[in-house]
Amino acid sequence: MIRVDNIVKYYGEHLALKGISYTINKGEIVGFLGPNGAGKSTMMRIITGYLPATSGFVYLDDYEIYDNPIELKRKIGYMPENISLYTEMTVIDYLKFAAKLKGISRKHIKGALENTIEITGLTKYKDRIIGHLSKGYKQRTGIAQAIIHDPEVLILDEPTSGLDPNQLIEVRSLIKSLGGTRTVILSTHILSEVEDTCERALIIDNGELIAEDTIEGLKTAMDREILGGNIELKVAGKVEDALIRVREVQGVIQAETDNFGSIIIECERGNDIRASIVKHLVQGDFEVLEIRAKERSLEEVFIYFTDKKKSEDFDKSKYIK
């Protein structure tokens, strides 16, 4: 388990992190989500022990990271955003070098190499020169050096930056496979990255943790508070006639059709009026084919929370679980 307690970081007079606290449980895959310059990379460097905090504490399994830094750092694997790979070396020679740096004994290096190369899908590429690899396989090599010593915690900073769509899918699948047995923390400004890969998201903006929950939990928190096109309805028959009927229901703010023949309904804050809509339509001899809460995108959630942070009455404690 990782526990971060009131971390503050100054660079000179610039306040980069503003008293951030959170807990990450063993086996979770958690995403740090935020715009460029939000403080994600700084937070990761502090967790790894690479960068000291100005104040606050980081605990790994209830031990403070600086109490026994060498022992605790052995439990962490780290791939920085711009990892320096030795491009003139082969993949296997580079991983041997990484294994020795991380203190793996001579008798265990062969097994560690075989296991890591298999997990990261590098078997066919182990004898290739790193400089000749595609961006996707360079990223796999970077992840391989981070897990060569079988760490309990894996920290990946922008692991899919610069990848093409096929490479994105492959690396995301690899990251998901690494969870469960180990804790995985990744940072990204790509919203789909968190939605596709992570179980939980921490939204960081301008050095502050402003929201923390599962993706669905964040969407639910947003839905509780705002007006929105949050009901999607499909009916048999004349959609325009059904639209008139829907607008008569108490609690409906606005209702319009979309390009796919569905009716999109905005309703009052915190008011689930789906049953009322169905009842009113049935009374008008309309057949309801489907009615459901319209899915929020993570992009909507991110924009909502970062915009809400600017308001004077913003209370981030309401959105941190």
Identify the residue ranges that each predicted region occupies.
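Short beta->alpha junction loops/turns
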Residues: I65, A236-K238, G270, K294-E295
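Non-catalytic surface loops within mature trypsin-like serine protease
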Residues: K26, K124, V235-G237, C267-R269, ...
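ABC transporter nucleotide-binding domain
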Residues: R172-E268
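Residue-level "edge-of-site" marker
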Residues: A112, I130, N259-F260, K294
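ABC transporter nucleotide-binding domains
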Residues: I2-V4, K9-A211
